[in-house]
From Swiss-Prot:
Disulfide bonds: none
Compositionally biased intervals (Polar residues): 535-545
Chief localization: cytoplasm
Protein's recorded name: Protein STU1
Keywords linked to the UniProt accession: Cell cycle, Cell division, Cytoplasm, Cytoskeleton, Microtubule, Mitosis, Nucleus, Repeat
Gene Ontology terms for molecular function: microtubule binding
Subcellular compartments: Cytoplasm, Cytoskeleton; Nucleus; Cytoplasm, Cytoskeleton, Spindle
């Protein structure tokens, strides 16, 4: 029956069955048969009304099964009639629409979808009725699901059929403030999508509607931010932060010169560009209304009621400049001119914040519009020259910066020079000082076309300004003018020589000695490196130092004479005291003798009397004191190559940190004395010190934190947990520890140990970085006490540098600190026998990289705070890690390796499933950084391929910000693998570059992940096979369409990678086939419509020309048109000229 056409009798029987008491299953089955007939054949026209009536009755039934069958059949009937005879459908639309609109709010998604589809069908025959029901019934009803579905239908109809939505805007504004959060979100998304492609006038009207209906600010800002108008102009980069010319460097004074008599220099204003949230306008009328609205706030005098409105108005103008106001530049500049008097009131306000906003606005107008603001210059220059003469330092400096910005951006006129001349004659020092900088800005800007100055009388004014400045009563003005004079001399040397000839002998001498003098041979030698102190390592001259340095040298010599003889103990009886100076960057850091000797203790600090040391062989008298020992240990080449050089910073005076309360009860030797805690002071190297072998971890820390006098320019590192953790880690057997010097990064107890000679392997004889003064003697056996370390999982990432100094096969042991009690001292042989047994309570701590549960246990102490400290009496009872044999040390290594392998496999699985989040990647990086030898070839390849696939995935189900963060961690993990497994990485370079190209295509140049992609690509090309990279990339870029945004990004990045490979690999020479592929790629991209792709193609051609030579290059590019060839030739010549000075040097 289902395959036959419906008859009138069947339709009549449908109504009879639905009204009867027949079983539900029979009704559902009959409706289903009717539905099949509708789907297969046309409906008899005479029965259409009865069929609609029956199916509407089934749809409104109380039984879900019958409703399902009836509503689906009704949807098929609507579709059938829209094709068979739309007139029949239009007659039933009025009676069917209420039922369909009611189903828009059904609980089941299926029915809501069917209702939306039915509305689309009915809209084709009765559009007015459908819109009326949707707008006046569904959208304003009480059912939130109906509201959401109706908005989705509206968006669908607009996108597919171009439905005008203007009449829906008031209803959508009401829905933006609906009580239901889901409705508000749907309304917000609907408004954004509807207006995204709307004209600018409609977007401007939308902003007014949002204000009129008082939509909450968060929703309003989200909508406006999404509807940023499209601009034909590329986004303007941030204004440069150096409008002020660099002042001339100060004359080099000796270290003894005191500046106490001079006036303290007020810190300069912050020139860091302020980050402004862009504000966008859509039409000229909107911009004009906005400026007219704020004009009222600038009327009259500044009061408590209007100053904040003025500040907000100026800030809004700055936001407009950061937005798209350049698309309406005429309207904006006309508006600014109309309120210029008000802006000047803001600039001259006594409120600093208001003045700063005004100056910032003028600077940004100058940077953005340049000569277009010429009509405003006269009033502004008068205002700022007057403001620069004020007594308020911040306002004066702001005026100086703003005038410099204006002069560097606007068109030169003779009036500008007149303003500078007036400033040179001002009675205040500040304008006269600033005028020299303004004059220098004019000279540098107009020096290339000096006829502007010559034909308008500007040169005469410049000469008058220079003469007046060189004869000024203030020395600062004279000094600034000398620098400006030499800029003038570079343009008009004859006139400058005439000015110099009129000066007296002293003034001429000072002028010739000025650092800006290009004729001075010593100009470059006498300038100290900026940012460092006046020590001998930072000064450029080799002349004798000042009187103060001579006094310090004399004190050092006297202290060396007064040192007592070296005792037989393992330490010096006293340590030279650090002499601090009043200047943080003193030129000399010498040490003087302490006034009294101390006995006992292993540092220079005063100590309580300690117990008698156990009977053992005396330390050789030739050993130098710990406090002045050379702290540069010799390290294997492999360790040096993997440990990055610590960053050099300026020595600064730091506040002494509080001393941790009894961090270790085993020894007090490393606690620094109060006199030695001051940073930036170096102890003098003892002439009797012999080179010693330090702990690997401690020696690394000490060599960075306490350099010798020979390396005085290395300054103190910032204390970090990484250094502390390293100092607590057990050291390898071949090295002997020293006490922590006064400048250790953390003031925590660190034990001093000496290893028995029989435990030192032969491979430990590494040369130290300092010359050997005396032959190395065998150290005496001394037990070691290990304090409880503080485990900090957060410091794992920071601790990479220090971790690499530990032997790879040695696990980190954490030993609980026992309660110290006096015990009889055993012999050395007994200690050696007891060492393995004492290590029984050793606990290995592992970290799961993919769990968040990390616990840090703090050590507890049962001893009083103040007590006598037994230095070495009870060390035999403590376990000694280094007394273990190599076999004992590696017992637990397999277990840890297995656990690391399991964690790695778990990470690989999650990476393949693309479920590993940012935190998981950081844990994985920590595992890869700390584990050694966990990679098999298959594991490495699986992890790397999984990372590449994860990197390429668009992560459509994740928010864009989170997706960027995840991909940034993927890049960091790949770079870590590249660093640790460089050889294994080499076969996967080409695959990695393809993945990076795919990733780059999804992001704009402003995305932060782009820089990471480019850096990784630049590293990969240095290790891959050049020919393979050329073949793979040219094949990948061959069919990429440059007309799309993604294609342009891929082409630009690919050619950048190829150019980088040519630049970084001078030994790579492409073959004829490879050259042809590269030339074909470049030739195709030179004809691209995207300017960035064309530029990268030109750069690639320049690199190819530099590599293959003139004739071969042009033969390969013979099919390229003449215009691109001219451009390529220009850049080739430009590069050759840039390289010429380097080659000549």
């Amino acid at each position: 029956m289902a395959d036959t056409k419906l008859t009138d009798q069947q339709v009549a029987d449908l109504n009879t069955i639905l009204r009867s008491d027949s079983p539900l299953d029979a009704k559902v089955q009959y409706v289903t048969i009717i539905k099949s007939g509708i789907k297969q054949h046309n409906v008899p026209e005479s029965s259409v009304a009865q069929l609609f009536e029956g199916l509407r009755a089934a749809t409104t039934s109380q039984h879900a099964a019958l409703v399902n069958a009836g509503f689906t059949a009704l949807n098929h009937l609507l579709t059938r009639l829209s094709r068979q005879d739309p007139k029949l459908l239009s007659k039933e639309a009025a009676r069917t629409l209420p039922l369909v609109v009611d189903k828009l709010g059904d609980q089941k998604d299926k029915f809501r979808s069917l209702a939306s589809h039915s509305l689309v069908t009915l809209f084709s025959v009765a559009p007015a009725d459908v819109e009326k029901y949707v707008r006046n019934t569904a959208m304003v009803g009480k059912n939130p699901r109906a509201k959401e579905t109706s908005m989705h239908w509206l968006l669908q109809m607009h996108n597919e059929n171009g439905l005008p939505f203007r009449t829906y805007v008031p209803v959508l504004m009401e829905l933006l403030e609906d009580a239901d959060g889901m409705v508000r979100d749907a309304a917000k998304n609907t408004v954004i999508e509807l207006f995204r492609s709307a004209p600018n006038a409609a977007k401007s009207d939308l902003k007014r509607q949002l204000k009129t209906f008082k939509v909450r600010p968060a929703i309003e800002q989200a909508i406006v931010k999404e509807l940023i108008p499209t601009s034909s102009r590329p986004e303007t980069p941030a204004a440069p932060a150096e409008p002020t010319p660099e002042p001339a460097p100060r004359k080099t004074f000796s270290a003894s010169t005191s500046s106490a008599a001079e006036r303290p220099i007020t810190p300069g204003i912050d020139t860091k560009p302020e980050v402004l949230e862009p504000l966008y306008v859509n039409t000229n009328r909107e911009l004009d209304d906005m400026i007219k609205e704020m004009a009222w706030f600038f009327e009259g005098k500044e009061t408590e009621h209007n100053w904040l409105k003025r500040e907000n108005s100026v800030h809004k103008l700055r936001r407009l400049i950061a937005g798209n106001v350049t698309d309406f530049s005429d309207t904006f500049l006309a508006g600014v001119k109309s309120i210029l008097d008000g802006i000047i009131k803001v600039i001259t306000s006594l409120r600093t914040s208001l003045c700063k906003e005004g100056c910032g606005l003028i600077q940004e107008i100058a940077y953005t519009f340049g000569p277009a603001m010429d009509p405003l210059i006269e009033q502004l220059m008068q205002c700022f020259v007057k403001l620069s003469a004020g007594t308020k330092k911040i306002s004066s400096q702001l005026a100086n910066v703003t005038v410099n910005t204006i002069l560097s951006q606007v068109t030169y006129t003779p009036r500008l020079m007149q303003h500078i001349w007036f400033a040179c004659q001002d009675k205040n020092v500040a304008p006269r000082t600033y005028a020299t900088e303004w004059l220098k800005t004019i000279l540098k800007k107009e020096g290339h076309h000096k006829h502007h100055l010559e034909h308008t009388g500007g040169v005469d004014i410049v000469e008058k300004c220079l003469k007046k400045g060189l004869a000024d009563a203030n020395p600062a003005v004279r000094e600034k003018t000398r620098s400006t004079f030499w800029v003038f001399w570079g343009i008009w040397p004859a006139k400058a020589d005439a000015i110099m000839a009129d000066l007296d002998g002293t003034a001429q001498k000072l002028l010739n000695k000025d650092p800006s003098n290009p004729n001075s041979a010593k100009a470059a030698e006498s300038v100290a490196r900026p940012g460092l102190g006046l020590s001998k390592s930072t000064m450029g001259t080799s002349k004798p130092s000042s009187i103060r340095e001579a006094m310090m040298a004399q004190r050092k010599a006297n202290a060396a004479k007064n040192l007592p003889a070296r005792p037989g103990s393992a330490m010096a009886q006293l340590s030279p005291e650090k002499i601090t100076t009043t200047t943080s960057s003193a030129s000399s850091k010498s040490s003087g003798a302490r006034s009294r000797p101390e006995t006992g203790g292993m540092s220079g600090a005063p100590m309580r009397p300690s117990r008698k040391r156990p009977e053992m062989a005396a330390r050789p008298a030739t050993a130098g004191p710990y406090s002045v020992r050379d702290m540069d240990p010799g390290s294997p080449e492999s360790v040096r190559s993997k440990t990055p050089k610590p960053r050099e910073t300026t020595p600064k005076r730091t506040v002494p940190r509080t001393r941790p309360g009894h961090a270790s009860h085993a020894s007090e030797s490393s606690l620094a004395s109060p006199s030695s805690v001051r940073t930036g002071q170096k102890s003098a190297a003892s002439p009797r010190a012999s080179p010693t072998k330090l702990k690997q971890s401690q020696s690394t820390m000490l060599s960075m934190s306490s350099p010798s006098r020979a390396d005085e320019d290395f300054t103190m590192l910032v204390p970090s947990m990484a250094n502390f953790r390293t100092s607590q880690r057990p050291a390898p057997p071949p090295q002997r520890a020293a006490s922590v010097p006064p400048e250790a990064p953390e003031e925590l107890s660190t034990l001093v140990t000496e290893i028995a000679p029989q435990n030192i392997p032969q491979a430990a004889a590494e040369p130290t970085s300092q010359p050997t003064l005396e032959p190395e003697l065998e150290p005496q056996p001394e037990p070691e006490a290990t304090p409880t370390p503080v485990v900090d999982p957060v410091a794992e990432a920071v601790d990479q540098t220090m971790d690499e100094t530990v032997k790879p096969e040695e696990p980190v042991h954490i030993i609980p600190e026992p309660v110290i009690e006096p015990t009889p001292e055993p012999s050395a042989s007994m200690q050696a026998d007891q060492a393995p047994a004492a290590s029984a309570p050793t606990l290995q701590v592992y970290e799961d990289p993919f769990t968040d549960e990390q616990t840090n246990s703090k050590p507890t102490f049962n001893l009083p705070v103040l007590e006598d400290k037994p230095v070495n009496a009870d060390t035999a009872s403590l376990p000694s890690v280094h007394a273990q044999s190599p076999v004992t040390q590696n017992i637990e290594a397999p277990d840890r390796a297995k656990q690391s392998l399991r964690l790695l496999e778990s990470g690989i699985k999650r990476i393949k499933a693309k479920t590993l989040d940012v935190h998981g990647f950081r844990k994985l990086q920590s595992l890869l950084r700390d584990s050694k030898g966990i990679f098999a070839d298959d594991k490495f390849e699986a992890l790397l391929i999984g990372l590449f696939q994860y990197l390429e995935d668009p992560l459509s189900g994740t928010s864009p910000e989170k997706a960027q963060d995840i991909k940034a961690q993927i890049l960091a993990t790949i770079r870590l693998l590249l660093k640790k497994e460089r050889d294994n990485f080499q076969p996967h370079v080409s695959r990695g570059l393809e993945s990076l190209l795919e990733t780059r295509s999804a992001y704009d140049i402003r995305a932060h992940i782009v820089s990471g992609v480019e850096v990784l690509a630049d590293e990969l090309v240095t290790i891959g096979d050049g020919s393979e990279i050329v073949v793979v990339l040219t094949r990948r870029l061959q069919n990429v369409d440059s007309s799309t945004t993604e294609g342009s990004r891929i082409l630009s990045t690919g050619m950048h990678v190829l150019r980088t490979m040519l630049d970084k690999r001078p030994n790579f020479m492409p073959t004829g086939t490879e050259l042809g592929q590269l030339a074909a790629l470049a030739g195709r991209c030179l004809a691209s419509a995207d300017s960035g792709v064309r530029m990268d193609a030109v750069q690639l051609c320049v690199a190819l020309h530099s590599r293959v030579g003139e004739q071969t290059f042009w033969d390969a590019l013979k099919d390229v048109q003449d215009d691109p060839k001219s451009l390529i030739t220009y850049y080739i010549v430009k590069r050759q000229r840039e390289q010429a000075p380097t080659i000549a040097a």
